[in-house]
Amino acid sequence: MSREEQPYIVATDGIVDALTKISSVFSAYLSANIHILNKYINYLRRVTSLKNERSIMIKIVKKLRFFNDTLLSTDLAQLQTTYEGEEPELALNIQTFASYLVKCLETIDLLNYFLLKPLQKELIAKTLNFDLVFPEDITDTVEDTYNHFVKFTQWSIESLSIDDPLLDIEVVQFSLRCAEEDQSYAEETDNIFLQEVLPVKDSQEYETLTLQWLDVLNGKLAILGERFEKVADDWYKKFGKNRS
């Protein structure tokens, strides 16, 4: 469906409320990452050979905290901005909010890569200490959570038939390019990014699906929080607060 054929989706009070809740769960996602990073940074103080890597993590925490503060202070009533007396069009007004979510996710993507791959290799190579290495099974949870937050953001944009390269998400575009080169199809893969996004028919459908996504993201975030808490507890048992 082309943008011209897409129904005029009004930014209703219900949609604003649903997206405000989405903003809150994104904030909680950022907070979960900030919390585990702060604990990790504290324990890495004992590894002097990783001073530079620790500095990078401190910078990332500052960035995530800034993103989080901005989300918390943003009033999504701006989604109901009107132009020339017309009812507020969601596809027009949501793009600034969506672009901010994309920015947050691209940063978390870099964090996940750095934290779970290069940093872990450096930690082992420089210290031979496996006590501070993230357990391998947490990687799947981190990636699954990230993928669902990305998929929601992709859906929130594409379901309104918004076609703007400035709103593209790198991991989604990479998956699409690989699928095209391999001539694979959505029904033949479990790659969530290849699952088709259908345009919504009206404001009520957008609100309903957003609330369904909210439940999904809250569920994924709860699992991630449990895994992070388990890792933090293991660190505490190994090092103890008096030696951190």
From Swiss-Prot:
Please describe the quaternary structure of this protein. Homodimer and homotetramer.
The entry's localization annotation reads: Cytoplasm; Nucleus
Q: Which GO terms describe its molecular function?
A: lipid binding; sequence-specific mRNA binding
Q: Its family? A: Belongs to the SHE2 family.
Which gene is transcribed and translated to give this protein?
Answer: SHE2
Tagged with keyword Zinc: no
Q: List the keywords (alphabetical).
A: Cytoplasm, mRNA transport, Nucleus, RNA-binding, Transport
Q: Name a single GO biological process.
A: mating type switching
The UniProt entry lists the main location of this chain as cytoplasm
Species annotation? Candida glabrata (strain ATCC 2001 / BCRC 20586 / JCM 3761 / NBRC 0622 / NRRL Y-65 / CBS 138)
Which is an annotated Pfam family here? She2p
Q: Mind naming one GO cellular-component term on file for this protein? A: nucleus
* Stated role: RNA-binding protein that binds specific mRNAs including the ASH1 mRNA, coding for a repressor of the HO endonuclease. Part of the mRNA localization machinery that restricts accumulation of certain proteins to the bud and in the daughter cell.
Its recorded name reads SWI5-dependent HO expression protein 2
